[in-house]
Amino acid sequence: MSALPGSKLSERVRTVGWQISRPYFCHFFPIRITAPPATCSANKGFPELEHARPCPKRCPGSISQAIHVGKMAAVQVAASLPCEQPREAPRELSLEQNNGFRRLSARLRALQPDDSTVSRMEIHLLFDQLISENYCEGGGVAPEDVSALLVRACQLVPLNQNHLVSKVSQLIHRLLNRLQVIVDEQNLDFLLTYTISAIQQCSPWTHMEILQALAALVYCNGSKCQKHLPDLLGKSGLLMKLSDVTHSDPEVRRAAVHCMANLCLSVPGQPYLEESYQLVCFQAFLTILQSPKSSDMDDITFCMLLQNALKGIQSLLNGGKMRLTQTEHLGALLAVLKKAMFHGLPGLNIEMPAVLYPTPLPQYDGRSPVKPQQPESSAARPSANKKKKYKVKPKKTQQGEKAEEEEPYGEVDAAPGLSMDQANTCVESAWCSSPWGSQGLPVDGGRATGREQVSSPFTISSWKRVSSSESDYSDAEGGMQGKMRSYQAKVRQGALACFLSTIKSIEKKVLYGYWSAFVPDTPELGSPQSVSLMTLTLKDPSPKTRACALQVLSAILEGSKQFLSVAEDTSDHKRAFTPFSVTIASSIRELHRCLLLALVAESSSQTLTQIIKCLANLVSNAPYNRLKLSLLTKVWNHIKPYIRHKDVNVRVSSLTLLGAVVSTHAPLPEVQLLLQQPCSSGRSSSSATPHLSTPDGWKALPAGPSLEEASLSSPKGTAEPCWLIRLCISTVVLPKEDSCSGSDAGSALGSTYEPSPMRLEALQVLAHLARGYFSMAQLYLMELGEVICKCMCEANPSIQLHGVKLLEELGTGLIQQYKPDSSTAPEQRVPVHMVAMFWTAMLNGPLPRALQSTEHPTLQASACDALSSILPEAFSSLPNDKQILCITMLLGLNDSKNHLVKAATSRALGVYVLFPCLRQDVIFVADTANAILMSLQDKSLNVRAKAAWSLGNLTDTLIVNMDTPDPSFQDEFSGLLLLKMLQSAIQASTDKDKVKSNAVRALGNLLHFLQPSHIERPRFAEIIEESIQALISTVVNEAAMKVRWNACYAMGNVFKNPALPLGTAPWTSQAYKALTSVVMSCKNFKVRIRSAAALSVPGRRAQYGSLEQFSQIWSALVTALQRSEDTTDFLEFKYCASLRTHVCQALLHLLGLASASDLPCIQETLTVNGDMIRSYILQFLKSGAGGDDPGAVHSPQERNQMVRVALRHIHSVQALAGDTAKGAIVGFLEDILTVHCDSSGERAVLRGSLDQ
């Protein structure tokens, strides 16, 4: 006790007011014996212990003592000293702890409230024993027992006993923290009332311990504290006063902020803080982050204060689902987050405005001048081609340095598993862009990767952690420096974690307004580059912080394709101003440059993985088809060495990046060339990752006889067509090499192949190549077939699944080659006989077994999808037994109980029914129809949607078969089955839009297919009426536009059946009324177009019904022509010309069918709107519709012929006596032809036509 100031000790003795013997001194004076801080898992949610967060190597039995004198009573639980790794405790330990807890708890319960000296002495003793017990999470102590003990302890301690209140607060904090107990609501109410009263009544020196107890009580209990929130967070609430910037004690202020942060933690399924209290806490946290460090606060306390405020905001955004709807709130938060991101970063101190505003241009972020730091800034700059060795003394196990390598802050899971030795012995460095001065590469600091320097044209400068023996500081000062750096890094990590939560809580379109504040841009000549996330990635000495920054950047880039699509720099910019598209393109280029610099400079495998993932996100979203070449080439050449990295996560992410390259805007000519390059690494100097400098470095696949005979590979002796395909094949099927097996955590013990993630990623890259660059993949068709067979033979379902997906992509690529509009020349296609050979090998292999793998329904479904990707021409070339096998398997799987399998089977049957070799097989079509009708009754919407699509395909087959010369199919197809199909389609037309769109399509085809023999049967009459009513209601109702388009198309199909009583049936007027309503007023022009096309289908005047009906149709079409440009949606304007074309075609079609009684109504409309109609018909004759409109007449001769046919028909009509309408209409048409032929130089042709 000699170390204690005598005056203060005497003051404390006077405060206690009695004399005590030495053995009981520690129970009355504030000498507290505390157990060590909790482990990482136990400390969760208690950041006040973060400066003393122990590593797993700390002994659970170590005890630290802290003597509280005067204000020292506010000091936190002291950090325990590191010691040897503890041995595993015996299994009886938890029972022993439980017994000790029960024994002490029983003694405490036996005590009665008493103000005597002996009673206080006994309570002190019991509290000390309870605090010093060696608890561990899950130690057999029931939570309700802990809560009951704490309630009893508080009942025994009156609030006028400051020392006992301090001790019971320590007990609450210790037990709840160590045993991870969440207090139940009833006991929580009592304990909160007690602690709130204690803060109000006890001496200020006790507030620190009381606030720690309060933080432990409210942790994950915010929803149960509603009645106490006014006392805590009200205008004069305790936490608001104690956390105010004007509060005199910085430690108490920090503890109060920690309590607020814990209050903001939410528990899923429970109510959260009211919005008003959320806003109060948010504003308090924001004020703390905006306020500078006060003079009476030390740096570490300030760092912990910032951490707690950041954690509080993160909790509000994550669990509370707080929405930053006000621009001021979001801008203020982003401003403080950007400042906190760089807190304590060596050599950098930025000044930020109070609020950031959305703007496409970089905003001011001035830098305060900083003094050169020693010894970092005084380090010598080694040259680029010479390594300099640094002596690195093993550091003492300082508490602050340990904390740097602890769990990541918040949600950011960066650099997991980084060992302490790696962190303490590394020499940190990074390349930085030229505006920062110098650029550095990492120097070998004993990392496992053993990275050497890479030659670079940039000047090199290294940042490093200098051991205390090399610095001007003493060992103690060096330890404090390391501790300070650790806490500053934690603030930066906390800010990045909070920023990540902010990104997830706001819309991307809002976030991209702040793009320039966080994403780098190419600096103007002579101006410094603004600080950004890449500044942290390149300059932060902490690998964990670098990884956090990369994770935030990845979140920003994810889903940014639409935003980045405006970028363009394909031409040199020479304008007086910089367009936004050029600015975004410049930002994309700078991101590529900085990320590639970071890739070269990084020595931590975990951070390296984050860099590559971030690059993959950038590559997936950047519009390379609008950017100058070489960006992808640089990414490609930089990433190739990392494919052979020792760390499996780096290798997997490297393949992911290559997959992103080959899938972005495929096919790109630049990537096509890269795929054909030799397989060198693209580097001239050595690096930390082993790479291949020659093609011999790649694994070689032995070519079997079957491959030599069947493969389309280039002849022997020529260059490898695609090294990436060769790499992926070898990764999937060949045993791994020793050079890559050292750190393959996650690979199966004794496995001879690459780890599963690596093989799965290789299969995905092959699938991307097959989808985007099939011309290269087809060279390996048979070889890839062997890879697929090998994958499907493996026990790992994931490998099997990805093998089957690759098969589907290959099949789809083969189908695309043979489509009529394919750009692949016939001689460059894979021959049909080879495609048949490929599929025969698949069907002779494990594919049937995958189809029958009932224990893996996802695999079964994918196998069905693969089976549906057989080229139709190749299917007919398969042996009969293989064709029967495919059909039998699919029809059998349609009875599956699993909805995934059933949906895939229904779709596959819908594909097969279109095959030319199967569509005329009445038995197959009937079996398929029955299977589809059964699936239409399934409970799963997905199954019904696939079945409806297949039903539409099947009815398309019926229509195709109508055009064949042989009528046997129509005669043999069952009328009863046709009736069932109509009934099912009617029922499906009332289903969800996904089902309805194909159901109405099927209805139209079925009504078109009906033969006179069907229509004459009484049982069909009613079903025909119901079917047409279903179509009419779908046309008129406000359904999805695709559904209405299909319904109009179906009505047109119905009108094509001459056997139906169109014109005389009662439903005729309803059908025409629905179509004319749509053609005049539907918001979607594509639906209007389809309606106009349907109105021009009937081929006889009688099918249009009465004179009144014909007049209504004619008037509706004229009105549609008038309104063809009336739209508020600018996206519809591109369909205006097509709409006018179809309406003009319909009007001319009606003129070609009009009877004498129809002519007066036509003349009437021509009198009023003749000029408008004439101008649009002339425009139609001149240009027609665009070439992309399949329903329009494209030939000028055909368009002229339509007018001439109409004119000839009107001439032939026998006009009624005294009727002038015929002459007027003839004159109108002749005038149109005259004007058109004058403009096109066809006057002679016109005269011959008129003479006829």
From Swiss-Prot:
SUPFAM superfamilies: ARM repeat
Protein name as it appears in the record: HEAT repeat-containing protein 6
Keyword Kinase annotated: no
Source organism: Rattus norvegicus
PANTHER family tied to this protein: HEAT REPEAT-CONTAINING PROTEIN 6, MALARIA ANTIGEN-RELATED
Spans of repeat HEAT: 230-269, 524-562, 586-624, 630-667
Annotated positions of the Phosphothreonine modification: 689
InterPro entries found in the cross-reference section: ARM-like, ARM-type_fold, DUF4042, HEAT6
Pfam families, sorted: DUF4042
Domain of life from the UniProt record: Eukaryota
Biased composition annotated in UniProt, kind: Basic residues: 384-396
Keywords: Phosphoprotein, Repeat
Region (Disordered): 365-417
Phosphoserine: residues carrying this PTM: 471, 474, 714
